[in-house]
């Protein structure tokens, strides 16, 4: 992949075209793209941009403690693949981070951070090989262009940040962290019905890449597509439907976890904890069709589809983990804790009544306040003095099955002491998926849950070339592998929690994922409340499993 004795420089080419007929999903299907990132809201519809990684250049994985460069399925240890580049001079000049005796990157030494060799630091070295968007004179600099890699950071990555041990077995076979570095990108601008085609090469690639020719070829290929030929409805798989729950946390098992957490809270060891239930669901519905169903019935700020060949990650998360953007050399970041849940009402009047009930529920508000304070504390770890503020508080957001209380915390990064990735470390994992105090809650979760969380509860999103970032919490998501969808959902437990109510909350949250495994006609006709898999019309299990 790389030859550090060559002098091939990073290149970028861009073309903007009219696009008022094709959709991101149809292009993903027709051209077998690797990644789709979208954003939409129940009240306002889809967001301005959608992003497709059409073809990949390479991947970076963390697997069993080793970092790999993956090219066309072949894994090479990262330090070996980048051997000619990992010099103290190169790394210090481009990244401003410490280097160990063998020339491999270490975490920045800072208050509260460890100094072990880190995945995010090594990912940053790879990111330095990407071209800068400014190299293309007509490329709008505000486009969401993930030149720093798009992918996920698994929940157990927290062991790199703090001295916590994870020993539970995995449910499926996937790396702890995985990022795709794109070769060709499509950015849909829905506001102006425009499409930006971008192709890139990376520094020191062995083979010279004609990025302008790639852009022209992609533009021509898109012109030949039409709505009919790129429709999922034209495939036999679109008629598949149904599912079978093969394994799931029982109501008794979950309520026992809640009781043990409440006992720890009573003893003063915890303030809050977020246990999850797991579910393995077999279904003939292919993951792209499942994603299509999910986005149709549950539009969310973070909708994602990642095809890693051996497995697929799809989801519709409502919750930001961290969004960081730099302007005039000042980096601001947002965290949006979501805590406090009610099911949606069957009518507008019932929905409003449930909203009022939620906002006046002492237990839910206490839970939300604890996690809001935790987010403020996490933001404060890497912010300048006085740089943390709550910019929105106790707002209600609605989704297909549930409504939530949401607040927003903003921080200003202390860039003299911290790298941008340190803000992600400070937020990871989100308090809404762990609890408070964070380390004690994570240790409690590890002792109670029987399997590794993996993607669930981690971060999913992308870095730009300058290490700005946009990551969601990996919830309302599924990992698909070998015909099985692996799902999880959790609920925040405090001293006043009712075990049965917490279990039912996890069922409400996971129901949107089960709904996506219905036939296409059912989803389009809104028949997502029909009985299936032993559930009642609200999608809740009748009694214990």
Residue positions per predicted region:
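Extended alpha-helical targeting/anchoring segments
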Residues: 1-545
